[in-house]
Structure formats: structure tokens, C-alpha cells
Amino acid sequence: MIDVNNFEYMKIGLASPNKIRSWSRGEVKKPETINYRTLKPEKDGLFCERIFGPQKDWECHCGKYKRVRYKGVVCDRCGVEVTRAKVRRERMGHIELAAPVSHIWYFKGIPSRMGLVLDMSPRSLEEVIYFASYVVTEPGDTPLEKKQLLSEKEYRAYYDKYGRTFTASMGAEAIRKLLADIDLQKEVNALKEELETAQGQRRTRAIKRLEVLEAFRNSGNEPSWMVLDVLPVIPPELRPMVQLDGGRFATSDLNDLYRRVINRNNRLKRLLDLGAPNIIVQNEKRMLQEAVDALIDNGRRGRPVTGPGNRPLKSLSHMLKGKQGRFRQNLLGKRVDYSGRSVIVVGPNLKMYQCGLPKEMALELFKPFVMKELVSKGLAHNIKSAKRKVERVQPEVWDVLEEVIREHPVLLNRAPTLHRLGIQAFEPILVEGRAIKLHPLVCTAYNADFDGDQMAVHVPLSAEAQAEARILMLAAQNILNPKDGKPVVTPSQDMVLGNYYLTMENANARGEGSVFKDSNEALIAYQNGYVHLHTRIAVPVASLNKPTFADEESNMLLLTTVGKLLFNEIMPDSFPYINEPTASNLEVKTPEKYLVPSNTNVKELLKERDLVPPFKKGFLGNIISEVFKKFKITETSKMLDRMKDLGFKYSTKAGITVGVSDIVVLSEKKEILDEADKKVERIMKQFRRGLITEEERYDRVISIWSDAKDLIQSKLMGTLDARNPIFMMSDSGARGNASNFTQLAGMRGLMANPSGRIIELPIKSSFREGLTVLEYFISTHGARKGLADTALKTADSGYLTRRLVDVAQDVIVRENDCGTDRGLEVTAIKEGTETIEGLYDRLVGRVAFKTVRHPETDEVLVRRGELMNEDTAKQIVDAGVESVTIRSVFTCNTHHGVCKACYGRNLATGSDVEVGEAVGIIAAQSIGEPGTQLTMRTFHTGGVAGDDITQGLPRIQELFEARNPKGQAVITEIDGDVVDVRDGDKREVTVQSELETKNYSIPYGSRLKVAVGDKVVAGQTLTEGSIDPKELLKVTGMGGVQEYLLREVQKVYRLQGVEIGDKHVEVMVRQMLRKVRVVDAGDTGILPGSLVEIQRFNEANKKVLLSNMRPATGRPVLLGITKASLETDSFLSAASFQETTRVLTDAAIKGKRDELLGLKENVIIGKLVPAGTGLARYKTLGIHSAHDERAENEEAGTPEEVLVQD
């Protein structure tokens, strides 16, 4: 048996007839399967035991030899070898075909490989193979040409005329003769000569032919092997036949297809023996050809063969294809043992790294561990009695279970797993009941709620798996979101509300201005009702024990509230005292304005002071980031647990409720609406007089109503009491926002009709007042569209993620530094005047390519090759530097991956990326996961020139698939000045540079962006709209396209409020640009017109340049992610993605080697993935658990000094 962890590559090729015979254990001669009476396999049939091995372990067909002691004996009566039954999964048979048959993949695929080799059209091939025409194989000395097609009539005429001086024949036999006659070397040389002169279609055809012929020449495959003499029969266990309850049999479709082949083959043999007339033999040969076609790929040609109920039969190709095929169903994703699933409920008292596991579930999952422990403790005599104990659930089992579970993490997963935080490890705590308890803070990462969601539990079995789960996957380790490096475990809903309530301030509350000797005294006063949580009080700075206060401040008083004292108790000791929600308070220290001398009259002072706003959701997130930066993981997770407990406690104490009386309707609403109605009437008058067009009228009406709604919204927010429960909910960020509130108390505003156009009649009522019937009806459009969109969006977004993962799965951090000599210059990304992504965001966590100096003082801000953290980036931005050159994935030279320096910081851990990190997968997940939050719609902005801007998910797909965008803009190919803009029947823009002048015709309906006298640079847009990236590539080269795609993707996500790290998009775009189309091969021997990886292209050129020969020339191509995935070097990865048969056909002809560099290939063949701890360098490491060591020590009789795992 092959050892999966020990082979270097996997190769695929065409099988020669002899190879097929060498695989086989015997010929299948009969179409029978099993005997209907004895249910034993028929001899020489499709399930024959002599060929494929015994059905029962160590037992021959006739029963002469039973038991393992006869291992390896071949029975003299029935000829069956005595061995294990599982050999029936690996032994193959064969069928000797009475006539050669063409393989449908090579004849029918697009392009037809047989057609390319023979230089015949697929149409004529089909006529020959299916016995409609003769083909001349040897013209002899007749005027006929080789490969000329003759109809039956013509053949007769020529035969009568020339007799046997020429040969022409039909069927796959003729094709095989033609294939065998080909001299590959001669053909290749002829084609290379032709390429030097050929143009257009002829050139394209020649390149395609050359590619196939070269493939045959280099791979050692014979072209004639595309025609089969022998057909392999796959092992019977892979096409099983099973008995159902009613005595009927269910069988794999392959058996039916094989039976048809065998029947027709046997009939053909008989006809040939009888010397039947030619026409009958030909018909039988055609039927045999069709039967083999159906077996290999049913439905590829003609009508598919159907089984009972007109269902097409599943052929060998269908076994591989699609979601249910071998690749995606069994090789890339398998069902696993030691798992369970149940409904989740909230576990507010769990620690960050814990989850509640139902007792009975835990017992079932950890059964083998419990049984082993029962035996080793002497509570059961053997495994069998231990098993019985566990199944009867005897009392001592629970104690053992507690022990087994104590240090054993489990994995919790919620589907859909959109990013790596969808599976995390927890320490299980046994709970009563049947629901899994989940920590409330990890819900965001899982996108889980408790309305009936279910989660699956998996048990890591080996010591290695447990160590990885504990060190890498524990929930407390995954505080940052890999997509942007911000905390993903921010408190939500009740927790936010509780902390908001806790840190509120009230003027003139009970006991305002009291001074207490320390926080304990203040708390006692609060518990006894002397002060309120919101009362502004003072405490001595010295009593707080905070090292961030200066020595001279220690005898002053700090103005704060009781709630804030409580809130600060959960923070680490050396963290600044947080008194106001500002960045400087977090990063530096408490602002001095809250410190007053100890003899101050606090009560009087407070009367003049404004109230400090409470801490909202965003600020809590900043606190977590800051704590993480200063104190790392353990401290942060402890602080998070304390923040959660505080939030729950005080949102309960606050007793915030919502009633109808909390929704106050605005008194000035009527006036605002009347005013708007008057404006609309004025517009209508202008329209009726013909002063404005229909479009302008519509636009103005819409803008009047949206302005009215905005006005109502701002007035509402102004009149609200800060203690209004609904306002508190939306202001704190717990639930809802200003626009929800406007709909409740103000007006609902404008709605869109089903086609997405805004109806100009607004909904004037609010929910508090109630909608009229018409208003309600109009509202339903939007609601229904929302639900339909969500359903479609989920599928689209999931498919996008799958394509992204596929294209980037082999991008792994392979080395420390690739030593590239190029960097990427970054500036803030802007859209008009609005900044989409600031320079700060683009610098944090990246390595500087050049030393950056302060523009005024010339002081070094960051050295070349240094990683920029938050502080450095802030200094650079504050110094007024506008552009910085950084190391980027775009310019990385590492083969099959990236290097540490070009990637920079790993956003998920906040520290340097490690060698072996699968950054491609992380990038794909980070871009795909927020996909569900993007909108589906194409915005139709009204206006005179209505242009459709594609946004949201469709725009992202358009960018990553490198499609021609909707509403394409015209771009200039040269730098220069706009010298002329012609408007009229033919709109034109003329750009002039020093060397040339170019005219660009502007399509009707496009809006111009340039005017005469503007300076333009190559690749700049002349009209509004999106650029076609393929055009841009021709004009600006790779740099321009990379920059454009990065900017556009960021724009879509940022406008939806989703932040994604640049480096993720860079990884994807780099994968789209990794190929070059060879224009002229020079002396490199690369085929012209082929797609080659940039690195391979450069290496080939380096070699020929060193020998003073001619290098190849090529131009970079931009591939969409689907195309890029299929163009990958690994055929296993491509075949398991899409177009399985095409990829495998191609790979077999080329005799491709898969070097197993990516993740998918290794998952498919069952090796460890070459990333993370699966890297070769970790293979030699062994893992000792304390448990094994204790056992060894006891055996050796040494004193028990045990190394415990960290």
C-alpha cells in the first residue's frame, strides 16, 4: 500500500492497452452480476470472485478453504484466492474489445484533442467514428488524399475504379491507424515554420495544434492510445450491488453501463466469428462505440442512456463532477466521527474559553476515553464491561467523565462557516439539559443568536490536535478579526446598554459634589442610597492606585461618578483611569481638567461643568484594542469577561423598558410637511408650463421629500431626552439607529417600487401614528424585496468565497524575505473630496521599503525594513507625509506564496506573520465573509444622464472576475493635454502629447469628466463610469491595474461600512496577475501563445540570456478568479474546482505532474496541508503528553517528576 505522507508528486497520463491489461486481474466475459438464487457472484461476470477477490474474509467461492490459516492459497476448485474481502475495493478487471473504440473525452471535448492532432474537424471525425463516412488511410497511387472523407457511394465508385490500390475504412479503427501514422517531430517542426508567417485564425489554430502535439511529444503518451482496445473495469466495491428490504436489489448505474458494453461486445465477437455481412458488423461496432461513450461520459453525445423512470444513468465522469462528485463530496469534505450537534443557549456566567456541553452528549463523545479510564482505574475489569457501564450510565461514570474532560478542549462550529472564526475551541463544562451553552461574546464571530441556532461539536483526538486546539484555536486567543485586526469580541446589545447606563452622568443627582475617601466608601454610600450611579462625586487620586497619574497629582481630587469608579475596577491596574470617551484618555492618561486641588468646593465647581457623555459601543471596542495592545491576550480576555458581567448586571439594574409613551411625535412635523407640499406644488407648476423636463421634476420632488425627512430627523434628535430608553438604545449602539427612530416617531419617508425606482409619493405617517392603507401597501414592496434579496445574496456570496478560496489557496508565507527591489507607493484612497481609506490605515502593520523622514526636521520616522505599528503610522501621518513606499504582496518575488516582509503583520494575532501561515485562505475568507452584508442592488441615480453604477456584491464580482464593467468609461492611452472637446452628432475628445495626438469618441449618454486645457495621464478616465481593467492593463501595465482593483474593491466595502485590510485584496489581485501570455518564444522553447507563470517566464529568460540567446517576450494578462483557478499548475486543485473533465483531459494528454504545493491537493490525497504545523520542518517533532510520561515513569520505577504540558 502507498504511504500518503511519503510521495513527492502525483502524475496523470494516458493508459496504453498493455498498461490496462497489467492493472487487471482477469477478463470480464459475461454481463451477469450475481446469481438470483444463491446470491453468489457469477463466474467471469462483473462481480466474479476469481477476478476481484473473495466476498467474505478468508473464504473462497466454493467454501473449500475457510479461515485465515489458508491465507494466500488459490482454491483449486473455484480459482479464488483466499484473502481479505477488502481487495474487492482495489482489484480491477478488463474487457477485451472486439473492435477499437474512441475515448469520448478526447474526441468530443472542446477543443477536440483528436481533431487537433489529426488536423481534422470534429464533424468529420464524428462521421468516421460513427460509421457514416469512410476515411482514406493509404491513398496508394490514386488521386485521393490521405484523411479524405468518402461517402458510401463515393467509396464504391473509387473501389470499382482503383480496386485495392488504396485503403479507406471506417470507425475508430481508421482513426487509430491515422493516429499511429503521425510523426510528431515532423508535424511540430512544420507547425513552428508555419507560425513564423501565419496570421489571424490560421495562427490561432496552429498554436492550439502545436500545444497538443508538443504535449504528446513531451509526455511520452502515444496519440493512438486515445483509441481503446481494452476497457478497464473498476473494482466491484466501488460500484456495489446491495439487497434492499423487499428482496429487490439496488445497483450502481455503472453496472448497467458495463453490462451494455459487455453484451454488445460479445454480440460483435459472435457476428465476426459467423462472418456476418459488413453492414450488420458496422452497426454493431457503432453500438459498441456508443455503449463505451455512455460508460465514460453519458449524455456528452446524443441522448443520454436512461434507467427506470427516464433518469439518465450516472457514468464515470459524473462520479467525479459537481458538488456530489468524488472530488467535492468525498475527498475535499468528509463526514467525521466524534461529533454531535445541538441547539445553543446563552451561557452568561461562562468564562471566555468555556462552553457548556450537555452531559449525555459529552458521555457519548468521550466514550472511548471514559472506558479506557474506567479500566485503568480498576473500576471495570476489561473494555467490554467498561462499555456496558457507560451504556447503562452507572454513577461512577460521571466522575470519570469529569476527569477526562477537564483538560480536553472541544471544537464548536456553526454553519455557515464563513471565516476561520466559525470554528473555535473551548474547554467543556458539563451542564444539565440538552442544549450547548455558548459564551455571549463569541456570538459575533459565529454570527450566532439564540433563536434556535444549532452548533456542532467536534472532539480533537490526538495529542497534537489537542495542543493545536488549545494554543491556536481557543476562543480566548481569537480576540481580533483577521479581516481588519480590530477586536471581534466587542460587547453587544445588553452589555453595551449596561455599560452605557453605568457611565452616564446626571446634573443635580442625589448627593452631587460629595467627596469620598476612596472608591469603597463611595460604593457603600451608593448601596445605602446616599448617591446614585450617575452622581458626580470626587475621590482622592492617591486612593485609586493608578501609576498613570503623576506624583504631583497624587494629592488632588478626581471628579468622576460612582458608575465610572465601578467601570474602572474591571480594567488592569496600570491602565489609565477612563473618565471620558476620548482617545487621549485611553492612550495617554486621564485629562487634567478632571483633577482639582483637594480644598476645592466640588459642589459649586460642578454646577458650571458640562456633563461628560457615556461610553458607547465604539468606545468599548477602542478600550479592548488598547488593552490588547498593552497587555496581550490573557489579560484582555479576563477584562472582557468582567466587562460582560458588568454590562449584564447594570442593564438589569437599569430596568430599561420601551413603551408607546417613549415615542414622542414631533410637534412641528405638520408645518414641515405643509412647507414641502407647497414646494412640490411650485415644481409641478413649472413642469406644467414646460419650464422643466419630466426627469428634472422627478429629481427635484424626490430631493424635496428627502430634505424634509432629514429635517424632521434632526429636529427629533434635538428634542429627545437623553434618558429616553429608545434614544439610549440607539445612542449607545446597542440596537437601532437614528433612522429607525425617525420612522417610529417622525415619518417613514420615500419608498421604492418593485423595480427599484423611488415612488415620489412619500409615506408621511410614522409607525406611532399608524399608516394609511395605501402607505402600508407601498411599504410592503420594500419588505418583500429585502427578503428576496437576502436569500439570493447568501448563495451569491458563498459562491464568491468559494472562488476566492480556490484561487488563493496555495498562497502561503514561505520565507522571511524575498529580497525584492520594488515597493508600492501608498497614499490615502479618496473619492472626490471624501477619504475612503486614510494613509494611517494603509501603513499599520506594513514594512517600510524606504526610510521615511520627517519633511521638516529630517528626523527618521521609520527605517527601511522596519514594521510600522500604530504609533509609527500616527507619527508619519502627523508629520504631514502624504505618500510612503511600503513592501507589498504585489511586488513580492517568492514562488508559490509570499514572504514575511512583503506581507507584514498578521492581523489576526497583532504580531508578525509566521512562516507557514495560509494567508491566501485568510484573505479569501476576509473578503468573502462580509459579502453577505453588501447590497445586491444596482443603484439607479435619476438625473438627466441616468447612469447605473453597479455597487455592492455585483461590483465585487465584476472586479474579481475582471469582466467588462457596466457603464464603461473611456480612458486615455497617453499622457498629455485635452486640446479639443467636440459636442454634437459625433462627440469626441482629443488628447495631445508631445509625440502624438489621439481622438476618443464618446458614447451617447456618457458624462464627460474633462474640459479643454486639463492635463491627463495615461489610464485616466475621460468620462464618468468604471474602467475596464483589461484595457487599463494595456495602457498602464501591472502597477496601474493593481492600484485600480485595490482601490475599487476597498471603495465598495468601505461605503458599506466594512473595513478590510489592504493586504487581503492584494493577495487576490496578485493571483489574478500571475500569468504572462507569450508573444514570441525566442530561444526559450516555451510555446508561443501559451499562458506561463511570471516566475517561470523570468527564469527561462534568465537561462537563455546567460547563454547569449534570444529571450522570450510576453505581455501580462489579467485573469478573472474563476479562470485563474482553472489555470493553476495543480490539476488536482483545478479539477476539484470546476470543469472537471476538461481539466483532467488536458492534464492526461500533457502527462502533468502535480507537485502538491497547495492546500487542496494535499487534502485530496490525504496528506497534512503544507501550512502551519503541517510544514515539513515540523514533521520531525514529537509530542509528549504528561499522561504518557507518567506511565513510563511508573514502569521504570523512577520517582514521579512529571513534565506537565504548558
UniProtKB/Swiss-Prot annotation:
SUPFAM superfamilies: beta and beta-prime subunits of DNA dependent RNA-polymerase. Pfam families: RNA_pol_Rpb1_1, RNA_pol_Rpb1_2, RNA_pol_Rpb1_3, RNA_pol_Rpb1_4, RNA_pol_Rpb1_5. Its cofactor is Mg(2+); Zn(2+). Binds 1 Mg(2+) ion per subunit. Binds 2 Zn(2+) ions per subunit. Zn(2+) 1 binds at C60, C62, C75, C78. The keyword Transit peptide does not apply. GO terms for molecular function: DNA binding; DNA-directed RNA polymerase activity; magnesium ion binding; zinc ion binding. One of its GO terms (biological process) is DNA-templated transcription. Belongs to the RNA polymerase beta' chain family. This is DNA-directed RNA polymerase subunit beta'.
